[in-house]
A protein has these predicted regions:
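M16 family metallopeptidases and their MPP-like homologs
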Residues: 46-48, 54-74, 91-145, 181-207, ...
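Acidic/histidine-enriched alpha-helical segments
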Residues: 93-95, 149-173, 261-269
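Active-site glycine-rich loop that binds ribose-phosphate moieties when present
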Residues: 211-218
């Protein structure tokens, strides 16, 4: 609607816009198909079949509750597993094996979604039809080797590898303050969600990292394999049934408990008093971060409308914040939502 020759968007109007976009997309379906199934106890595969790309993508995610006691351990674990296995004990041999797989790549994943921490790996590789031999299955076998047969010394991760990766994670934690924009947003979340899981940083806290040892991390690794729900994501040209068959075979060594650690996000619908926090640093540009609670989670039917509302408000160079606060009023260097 319009007021004083300016356009204002209400939440119902944005929801209606989102529904119209969904209808348009439904009318223009292409050859992309997605499929989700439980291939092993507590292991779920989402496969998106498409022949549009020459490179296939895959990710393996262990889902853990976002808690202070294990956030740092979950963040440290993938990088240590990627440092060596029984048959490929160092970075050089791992790189050589990936070169043999037509330049495939394997990297670590540490993400936070709501009150859930995801830790694992992602892979990129050439699609099978572009080479003379299968690539997806051997890449998955190599990933399983790194995951299930890590290099060990005296019943624990090698001390030198552990200390090296622990220092890398420590440096990452200490360097968070160097990016003042993301640091301000992180401090906002920490203040808003004090005492809640969502307030914990994605890679954990440095004091919890310092308590870890090579032996305690290996014990955590064993428990993580057994008790975590696992989400697998595949994008490529193979049929979902073939992908599932390959993964059932390569992940057959995954130990499974009778019950898995529950994960989820609790909405925060109750009103809260307004909080204000400030921090003084030696900077030339101040940062102002504003946070608002809603009761909408990613599974809510209203979530796409909320995302669209944030985009209209501050999602780019045509947003209300950018055009008004930055361009017209010249009050800041950047403004976004």
């Amino acid at each position: 609607m319009r007021r004083n020759n300016k356009r204002y968007f209400t939440f119902p109007a944005l929801y209606g816009m989102m529904e119209r976009v969904k209808n348009i997309n439904a009318q223009n379906k292409d050859d992309t198909m997605d499929h989700r199934t439980e291939i092993l106890p507590g292991v779920y595969l989402t496969a998106v079949q498409s022949d549009k790309f020459k490179t296939g993508c895959f990710s393996l995610n262990f889902l853990r509750p976002m808690c202070k006691e294990e956030a740092a351990a979950n963040a440290l674990l993938p990088s240590i597993l990627l440092r060596g296995s029984k048959d490929h004990p160092d970075i050089a041999s791992i790189s050589a094996r990936l070169d043999e797989l037509y330049g495939a790549s394997i990297g670590t994943l540490i993400r936070k979604k709501g009150e859930v921490q995801l830790t694992g790996f992602y892979c990129d590789y050439v699609q099978d039809e572009y080479v003379e031999e299968p690539v997806f299955a051997p890449v998955m076998e190599f990933l399983a080797e790194l995951l299930f047969a890590p290099r060990l010394e005296n019943g624990a991760f090698p001390e030198a590898v552990f200390e090296s990766e622990k220092q890398n994670l420590r440096n990452a934690m200490l360097s968070r303050i160097n990016d003042k924009r993301s640091y301000a947003n992180a401090q906002l979340i920490r203040a808003m969600c004090q005492g809640q899981s969502f307030g914990i940083p994605r890679i954990g806290e440095i004091e919890d990292l310092e308590h870890l040892t090579a032996k305690s991390l290996y014990a955590h690794y064993q428990a993580l394999l057994e008790t975590s729900r696992v989400e697998l994501f595949y994008m490529g040209s193979l049929a979902p049934e073939k992908v599932a068959a390959v993964l059932r075979k390569t992940l057959s060594r995954l130990p499974r408990a009778k019950e898995f650690t529950p994960v989820g996000t609790t909405p925060n619908p109750a009103p809260r008093p307004v909080q204000e926090r400030s921090e003084t640093l030696d900077v030339t540009q101040g940062k102002l971060s504003l946070g608002f609670f809603t009761d909408i989670t990613a599974n809510d039917a209203r979530y796409p409308a909320l995302v669209l509302a944030a985009t209209v408000f501050g999602g780019g160079a045509t947003s209300k914040l950018f055009l008004n606060v930055r361009e017209q009023m010249s009050l800041c260097y950047y403004a976004s939502a």
